[in-house]
C-alpha cells in the first residue's frame, strides 16, 4: 500500500485516467517507502491535454489583465495557506529537510506567481508615429499553449516559475513534472482550479522523457520551457525547432566557480562555500562546486570549511533539526558515488565524507556524506563535470587574471560568485566571468525580480524578472492610415 495512492492526470480542471494503462512508482528517498503509483500519459492523453489547453486559453485570454491578476493572487493565497501541507509532500517526494521545504520551495514559488500577477496589467504595446496622418501601434499577444517540463530537484517551485509568466500573459500550459518527483505539480493544479483559473489553462501530464518528447514535438504547442540536463536540453531544443519552430527557454546545468580572494572575510567565505555546495544535499543547478581559493589563505579557509561540514546535521528529512537529507534517488546516489571514486582515483585529497551513509536508518535511504576534496586540478572529472550532489572541489590560484581564465574554461555558464572586501575587484571580476547569475559576497538567492538563466551551454532565455514576461508574448504590429491611400497602380 502506498502513502498517497494512485495519482492520475490533471486535464480540463479535474483528474482523469490515463489511457496508456501504464503506471510508474515514486519512492521516499529517505526510507525507500512507496509513495504513490502514478499513471503515465499516452500520446492520446497529451493530445487531449493540449486540446483542453487550447480551449481554456481562449477563455483565459479574453479576460482582462486585472481579472487574471486577481485569480493568480488568489492562487498565491492558497499556496501560502497550504504551505505546511505542500512542504510535507515535497519533503517525502524529494528527501529535502522539512525545514528547507517549509521556508523555501512553496514560499519562493508563491512569490513568483505574486510577482507576475502584479505585472499582468503592465503588459502593453507601443505607439510609433510615422507621419501626420499615419502611425503604427504594437500589441503584445499571448503565444497560446505552452509546455513546461520540470526537473526533480525543485518540483513545485519550478512549476510555479514556469506557469506564472505564462498564465499572467494569457497563455495556457501543459506541464510535465519529473517522473522522479511527480506529486506536488498535481496539488498546484488543484489550487489553480480552486482559485478560478479556467479549466484547461493548467494541465498536468505525467511520465518519463517520452511524454516530454510528445509535448516538445506537438504541433499545437507554441513554446517549451525546460529545466534539466544539458544533453536532454539539446534534444528538446532540436525537437522543438524541427517540429514547428517553437520558442524555447532552457535552464540547464552548471559547474559554477566560487572565487575567494586573499582579502576575503574567511568566516563569510566558508559559510558561503558550504551553502553553495551542501544546501539541498548539493542538488542545486547553481551550486558553486569549483571553489577557487587564493593560495595565501587556502589552508585557513579549508579548515573553516571543514569545521562547518562537521556541524551539518544529516538526518531524517521529516525531523525539524535535520538540515541535510538524502539524494533524490538510488540512481542519483550511484552517480554521485561514482564521481567521488573518480576524484579519489585522479589524486584529489579527500578531506571529508566520501562515503555512503548506511548506519541505522540511513541504510534504507539514499544518503551520502557531505564531501570535500582538496588539491584538485582543473582537468579532474569532479572539477569538469556537473555532479549534482554534495561534493566540493577546492582549487588554489595566485592571480586575478589566472583565476578568471580558469573559471571561464568550461562549456557551462550558469552561475558564478566572488568573495572579497574590494568592491572594485568584485565588480571587475564579475564583469569578466561568463555566467548568467552572479553573486558578490553571497550565494544562492534567486528572488522573483531577478532573471535566472545561463550563458553558453547552461541555457537559453531566462526565468523570473520582467524580461521573462515578454518572452511569453508575441508582438503584432499594426499600421493605421488616417489620410488618403495612394494606390500603386
Curated annotation (Swiss-Prot):
K(+) 2 binds at residues 245, 456, 459. PROSITE patterns: ALDEHYDE_DEHYDR_CYS, ALDEHYDE_DEHYDR_GLU. K(+) 1 binds at residues 26, 93, 180. It comes from Burkholderia orbicola (strain MC0-3). Belongs to the aldehyde dehydrogenase family. The gene is betB. The record marks 247 as: Seems to be a necessary countercharge to the potassium cations. Involved in the biosynthesis of the osmoprotectant glycine betaine. Catalyzes the irreversible oxidation of betaine aldehyde to the corresponding acid. NCBIfam families: BADH, PRK13252.1. It catalyses: betaine aldehyde + NAD(+) + H2O = glycine betaine + NADH + 2 H(+). Binds 2 potassium ions per subunit. Its cofactor is K(+). The active site is at 162 (charge relay system), 251 (proton acceptor), 285 (nucleophile), 463 (charge relay system). GO terms for molecular function: betaine-aldehyde dehydrogenase (NAD+) activity; metal ion binding. NAD(+) binds at residues 150-152, 176-179, 229-232, 253, 285, 386. GO terms for biological process: glycine betaine biosynthetic process from choline. Keywords: Metal-binding, NAD, NADP, Oxidation, Oxidoreductase, Potassium. Gene3D superfamilies: Aldehyde Dehydrogenase, Chain A, domain 1, Aldehyde Dehydrogenase, Chain A, domain 2. This is Betaine aldehyde dehydrogenase. Pfam families: Aldedh.
Amino acid at each position: 500500500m502506498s502513502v498517497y495512492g494512485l495519482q492520475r492526470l490533471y486535464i480540463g480542471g479535474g483528474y482523469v485516467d490515463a489511457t496508456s494503462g501504464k503506471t510508474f512508482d515514486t519512492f521516499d528517498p529517505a526510507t525507500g517507502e512507496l509513495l504513490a503509483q502514478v499513471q503515465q500519459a499516452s500520446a492520446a492523453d497529451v493530445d487531449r491535454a493540449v486540446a483542453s489547453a487550447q480551449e481554456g486559453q481562449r477563455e483565459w485570454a479574453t479576460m482582462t489583465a486585472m481579472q487574471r491578476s486577481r485569480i493568480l493572487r488568489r492562487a498565491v493565497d492558497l499556496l501560502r495557506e497550504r504551505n505546511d501541507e505542500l512542504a510535507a509532500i515535497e519533503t517525502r517526494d524529494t528527501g529535502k529537510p522539512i525545514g528547507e521545504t517549509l521556508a523555501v520551495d512553496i514560499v519562493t514559488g508563491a512569490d513568483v506567481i505574486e510577482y507576475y500577477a502584479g505585472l499582468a496589467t503592465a503588459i502593453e504595446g507601443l505607439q510609433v508615429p510615422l507621419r501626420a496622418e499615419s502611425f503604427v501601434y504594437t500589441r503584445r499577444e499571448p503565444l497560446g499553449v505552452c509546455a513546461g517540463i520540470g526537473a526533480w530537484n525543485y518540483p513545485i517551485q519550478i512549476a510555479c516559475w514556469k506557469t506564472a509568466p505564462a498564465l499572467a500573459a494569457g497563455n495556457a500550459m501543459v506541464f510535465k513534472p519529473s517522473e522522479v518527483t511527480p506529486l506536488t505539480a498535481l496539488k498546484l493544479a488543484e489550487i489553480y482550479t480552486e482559485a478560478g483559473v479556467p479549466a484547461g489553462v493548467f494541465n498536468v501530464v505525467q511520465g518519463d522523457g517520452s511524454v516530454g518528447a510528445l509535448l516538445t514535438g506537438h504541433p499545437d504547442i507554441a513554446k517549451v520551457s525546460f529545466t534539466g540536463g544539458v544533453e536532454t536540453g539539446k534534444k528538446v531544443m532540436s525537437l522543438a525547432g524541427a517540429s514547428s519552430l517553437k520558442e524555447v527557454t532552457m535552464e540547464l546545468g552548471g559547474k559554477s566557480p566560487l572565487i575567494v580572494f586573499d582579502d576575503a572575510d574567511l568566516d563569510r567565505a566558508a559559510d558561503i562555500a558550504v551553502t553553495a555546495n551542501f544546501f539541498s544535499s548539493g542538488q542545486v543547478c547553481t551550486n558553486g562546486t569549483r571553489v577557487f581559493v587564493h593560495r595565501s589563505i587556502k589552508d585557513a579557509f579549508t579548515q573553516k570549511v571543514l569545521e562547518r561540514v562537521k556541524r551539518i546535521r544529516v538526518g531524517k528529512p521529516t525531523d525539524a533539526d535535520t538540515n541535510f537529507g538524502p539524494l533524490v534517488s538510488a540512481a542519483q546516489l550511484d552517480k554521485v558515488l561514482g564521481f567521488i571514486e573518480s576524484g579519489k582515483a585522479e589524486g584529489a585529497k579527500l578531506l571529508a565524507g566520501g562515503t555512503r551513509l548506511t548506519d541505522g536508518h540511513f541504510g534504507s535511504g539514499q544518503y551520502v556524506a557531505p564531501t570535500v576534496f582538496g588539491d584538485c586540478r582543473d582537468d579532474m572529472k569532479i572539477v569538469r563535470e556537473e555532479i549534482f550532489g554534495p561534493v566540493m572541489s577546492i582549487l588554489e590560484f595566485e592571480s586575478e587574471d589566472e583565476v578568471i581564465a580558469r573559471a571561464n574554461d568550461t562549456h557551462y555558464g550558469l552561475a558564478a560568485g566572488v568573495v572579497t572586501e574590494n568592491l572594485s575587484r568584485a565588480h571587475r571580476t564579475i564583469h569578466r566571468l561568463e555566467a548568467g547569475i552572479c553573486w558578490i559576497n553571497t550565494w544562492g538567492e534567486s528572488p522573483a525580480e531577478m532573471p535566472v538563466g545561463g550563458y553558453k551551454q547552461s541555457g537559453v532565455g531566462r526565468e523570473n524578472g520582467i524580461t521573462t514576461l515578454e518572452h511569453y508574448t508575441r508582438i503584432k504590429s499594426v499600421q493605421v492610415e488616417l489620410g488618403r491611400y495612394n494606390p500603386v497602380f
